UniProtKB/Swiss-Prot annotation:
Family statement: Belongs to the PRAME family.
Keywords: Leucine-rich repeat, Repeat
LRR repeats: 97-122, 177-201, 202-228, 229-264, 265-290, 291-322, 323-341, 347-374, 375-399
MF GO annotations: ubiquitin-like ligase-substrate adaptor activity
GO cellular component: Cul2-RING ubiquitin ligase complex; cytoplasm
Signal peptide: none
GO BP term (any one): negative regulation of cell differentiation
Membrane among keywords: no
Designated name of the protein: PRAME family member 12
InterPro entries from the UniProt entry: LRR_dom_sf, PRAME, PRAME_domain
Superkingdom of source: Eukaryota
Gene3D superfamilies (UniProt xref): Ribonuclease Inhibitor (3.80.10.10)
Length: 483
């Protein structure tokens, strides 16, 4: 017969606190701070809303990372937490142990709860994230309470917790500092976005992603808010279209309205654009407005003119560039000089270069090779999808001998791998792949390298040849179509 172990002190405290709400305040006054997180988790799990309200008031840590505990919206619990904040805000003089300054609604700090429950140790990454949260700019002096959240607009509506919080926050304007670090837009009416932005401190926003199709006219309505995000580091724009109905002079006015916002962004470093056309012939206007060196320029499947590339190559802000991605921009008829100059400008810092599916031909490749060979920090190079001969590829590989940090290399299948009609000759591709691998191994020891074909017209998959001959890959649906 086994004896049941006596309940631990923590379990007794949980039972006492959660059984009798009237006992909560006196108990919390004397409770060791180490017991607060596990007790809070237990009250959260049991949905003891009155107890949660009381614990929020008496929280003995500067930060309450609620977001990592509340994985999905539970309006009842969320209201209980906000009621605790109301009680805290109403206190003109707080008890010494009541230290809550930050309510963090982001899902970033699971280890806070894990360490108190004994599940894990607090990681340096988690500590870093919590310190970062406290570095938010606070204009006009310290605010009594900061609420940190990331905003993600999708499915056309706001979730009920966010809706409730925004309404609650409006009624307490001046008492709260609502800090949003990341803003993601996947689909919602622009007037709803503006309504939300009017409730947060725009100075706090560091990353913005617009991942839904917008007309240029909608982007322009958003642009003034972008200019107020003075700590913005990263901007992502997907599928910004220009209506055929917009007159040319009106479009140019829109471009000025958008690009001028960058004059106010002193810390901007990372520009990502996919399928954006309105800057064609106007990229120089944006580049002139940049206030800080760029680390990342990603412009994929965008419309750019040769003059745009030339302006980019001479822009002072790209001299510390770490990532350049021009994937899907057709460069076939461009002079190779701007790209060569661009690589020269960034040769000391460039780590990632993606020129996939740019339509680059042998003569252009030959012109940029001297600059490419001096990019000493390059670790990732993607060049597949270009129309390059066997001789030009061998020359390219020879020019990578000094690039000791290369860890991922993606190259196109040689033109000789295809027949006159453009169909892949699989046997020929395998033979040429083996020759290229031998050439490369005679020069240096590659880490990850792949030679791949153009996408199959039937399935869209690229056949590839990597370091080991046994790893030649060919999509099964295409077997019959290859020689």
């Amino acid at each position: 017969m086994s004896l049941q172990a006596p309940p631990r002190l923590l379990e007794l405290a949980e039972q006492s606190l959660l059984r009798d709400r009237a006992l909560a305040i006196p108990t919390l006054e004397e409770l060791p701070r180490e017991l607060f997180p596990p007790l809070f988790m237990e009250a959260f799990t049991r949905r003891c809303c009155e107890t949660l309200t009381t614990m929020v008031q008496a929280w003995p840590f500067t930060c309450l990372p609620l977001g990592s505990l509340m994985k999905s919206c539970n309006l009842e619990i969320f209201r209980a937490v906000l009621e605790g904040l109301d009680a805290l805000l109403a206190q003109k003089v707080r008890p010494r142990r009541w230290k809550l300054q930050v309510l963090d609604l982001r899902n970033v700090d699971e280890n806070f709860w894990g360490i108190w429950s004994g599940a894990s140790a607090l990681s340096p990454e988690a500590l870093s994230k919590r310190r970062t949260a406290g570095n938010c700019p606070r204009p006009g002096g310290q605010q009594p309470l900061m609420v940190i959240l990331d905003l993600c607009f999708k499915n056309g509506t706001l979730d009920e917790c966010l809706t409730h919080f925004l309404e609650w926050g409006k009624q307490r304007k001046g008492l709260l500092h609502v800090c949003c670090k990341e803003l993601q837009i996947f689909g919602i009416a622009i007037h709803r976005i503006i309504e939300v932005l009017n409730t947060v401190e725009l100075d706090c926003i560091q990353e913005v992603e617009v991942c839904c199709p917008w007309e240029l006219s909608i982007l322009i309505r958003f642009a003034p808010y972008l200019g107020q995000m003075r700590n913005l580091r990263k901007l992502v724009l997907f599928n910004i279209h220009v209506s055929a109905c917009i007159p040319l002079d009106r479009k140019e006015q829109f471009v000025i309205q958008f690009t001028s916002q960058f004059l106010k962004l002193d810390y901007f470093q990372k520009l990502y654009m996919h399928s954006v056309s309105f800057l064609e012939g106007h990229l120089d206007q944006l580049l002139r407005c940049l206030q800080a060196p760029l680390e990342t320029v990603v412009m994929t499947e965008c419309l750019l003119s040769e003059s745009d590339l030339k302006h980019l190559s001479w822009c002072p802000s790209i001299r510390q560039l770490k990532e350049l991605d021009l994937r899907g921009i057709t460069l076939t008829h461009f002079s190779p000089e701007p790209l060569s100059v661009l690589l020269e400008q960034a040769e000391a810092t460039l780590q990632t270069l993606d020129l996939e599916d740019c339509g680059i031909v042998d003569s252009q490749l030959s012109a940029i090779l001297p600059a490419l060979s001096r990019c000493s920090q390059l670790s990732t190079f993607s060049f597949c999808g270009n129309l390059i001969s066997m001789a030009a590829l061998e020359n390219l590989l020879r020019h990578t001998v000094g690039l000791s940090k290369l860890s991922l290399e993606l190259y196109p299948a040689p033109l000789e791998s295809y027949d006159a009609q453009g169909a892949l000759c699989w046997g020929r591709f395998s033979q040429l792949g083996a020759e290229l691998m031998k050439t490369l191994r005679d020069l240096r020891q590659p880490k990850i390298i792949v030679f791949s074909t153009v996408p199959c017209p039937r399935c869209g998959i690229r056949a590839s040849y990597d370091l080991e001959p046994s790893h030649c890959l060919l999509n099964a649906c295409c077997q019959g179509g290859f020689i």
